């Protein structure tokens, strides 16, 4: 049993990215699906698919790279887990973080659902900062 399933998901994505893997499998949950949807929408991954396995299911994340198959360049340059089970990090609507001066995104859980920092700024809500991705 993991103590932090979100950190496990982000670590699997980070490791697959470093190893230049085509895809990575992650145990599914609703929060992980929403995070994968944000990563797809923001262009950090190609796509993801939900695979029913009779238990909780699996999310298969299809990684995205620039360039040819021989000379690949990573789209994801860094992933950092911010709010952890031992230390939750919350921000108000006035203190929403900008990752790498706007080149990256912060993923937040808010009362309006899982959002990027840009979406939260537009709506005017704060929340718990899950991760930074650039």
From Swiss-Prot:
Signal peptide coordinates: none
Gene Ontology, cellular component aspect: ribonucleoprotein complex; ribosome
Domain of life of the organism encoding this protein: Bacteria
GO BP term (any one): translation
Keywords: Ribonucleoprotein, Ribosomal protein, RNA-binding, rRNA-binding
InterPro entries, per database record: Ribosomal_uS8 (IPR000630), Ribosomal_uS8_CS (IPR047863), Ribosomal_uS8_sf (IPR035987)
Pfam families in UniProt: Ribosomal_S8
Quaternary assembly: Part of the 30S ribosomal subunit. Contacts proteins S5 and S12.
Function statement: One of the primary rRNA binding proteins, it binds directly to 16S rRNA central domain where it helps coordinate assembly of the platform of the 30S subunit.
Similarity field: Belongs to the universal ribosomal protein uS8 family.
Name used for this protein in its record: Small ribosomal subunit protein uS8
GN (gene name): rpsH
